[in-house]
């Protein structure tokens, strides 16, 4: 990708963005053994529509309108944001792969996770992704990044609540009484 106003800071942003989406699009789906591979057509259409709108906002807000000098790498926003982004991505990926490993070692069906952050919260994968995009909003210090963070929370937090309620209502016993949403 070449655009005359882009500099190395923009390319670092692009690498982080692509790292998330390459993993989410081309690696993770092939690691998951889906029991029911059918889904309503509205789900991929909604996902593609969201991503088209979001990429447009991010591209305009960060890559076309955002002005970042080389000194941005020393800015506390960048340092804190990249730390959160990488930490959130790690939490997200590790949580997902922990669930995958449970299915591979214990067979099909649901198995209660009780390791890593699953000891404390019901959906650390969602938590990690929210932290990741909070980091994005901070490291880009942009309204576009903030919009994406709010969209992520609006999507994932209700799902985390529903997942936690499912834990409580299902036959699965939560052995950690301090586990939170």
Where are the regions a protein language model picked out?
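Helix-coil boundary and interhelical linker segments in multi-pass alpha-helical membrane proteins
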Residues: 1-15, 55-79, 137-147
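Transmembrane alpha-helical segments that form the membrane-embedded catalytic/substrate-channel core
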Residues: 21-30, 52-61, 84-102, 152-167
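Single conserved hydrophobic/aromatic residue that forms the stacking wall/gate
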Residues: 172-181
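Core segments of transmembrane alpha-helices
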Residues: 1, 46-59, 92, 125-133
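Solvent-exposed interhelical
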Residues: 105-130
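Membrane-interface transmembrane-helix boundary segments in multi-pass integral membrane proteins
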Residues: 119-126, 141-154
């Amino acid at each position: 990708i070449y655009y005359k106003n882009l500099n190395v800071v923009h390319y670092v942003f692009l690498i982080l963005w692509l790292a998330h989406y390459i993993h989410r699009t081309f690696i993770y789906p092939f690691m998951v053994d889906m029991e029911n591979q059918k889904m309503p057509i509205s789900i991929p259409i909604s996902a593609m529509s969201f991503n088209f709108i979001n990429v447009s906002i991010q591209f305009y807000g960060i890559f076309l309108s955002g002005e970042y000098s080389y000194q941005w790498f020393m800015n506390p926003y960048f340092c804190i944001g990249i730390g959160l982004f990488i930490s959130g991505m790690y939490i997200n990926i590790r949580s997902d792969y922990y669930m995958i490993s449970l299915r591979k070692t214990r067979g099909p069906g649901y198995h209660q996770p009780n390791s890593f952050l699953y000891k404390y919260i019901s959906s650390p994968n969602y938590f990690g992704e929210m932290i990741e995009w909070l980091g994005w909003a901070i490291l880009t210090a942009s309204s576009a990044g903030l919009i994406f963070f709010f969209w992520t929370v609006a999507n994932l937090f209700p799902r985390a609540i529903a997942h936690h309620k499912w834990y409580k209502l299902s036959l699965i016993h939560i052995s950690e009484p301090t586990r939170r949403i």
